Curated annotation (Swiss-Prot):
Antimicrobial activity depends on the dehydration degree and integrity of flavucin. One of its GO terms (molecular function) is signaling receptor binding. The keyword Amino-acid biosynthesis does not apply. A heterologous expression system was used to produce flavucin. The gene has been fused to the leader peptide gene sequence of the model lantibiotic nisin. The construct was plugged into the nisin expression and modification machinery, and produced in L.lactis. Growth conditions that yield detectable antimicrobial activity in C.lipophiloflavum could not be identified. Belongs to the type A lantibiotic family. Pfam families: Gallidermin. There is a cross-link at T28-C31, T33-C38, T42-C45 (Beta-methyllanthionine (Thr-Cys)). NCBIfam families: lantibio_gallid. It comes from Corynebacterium lipophiloflavum (strain ATCC 700352 / DSM 44291 / CCUG 37336 / JCM 10383 / DMMZ 1944). This is Lantibiotic flavucin.
Amino acid sequence: MSDFTLDFAEGDAADTVSPQITSKSLCTPGCITGWMMCNTVTKGCSFTIGK
């Protein structure tokens, strides 16, 4: 079972389609990485950007 729902929805224009990506993870709802970025201290997404 995937952590993401990759659903497509029609846009405002007749010929356009836009993806609707949502996380199913309970720890990080809406986080694009799902449970892999689960941070139990902040209860949300956490990203580390380094060189």
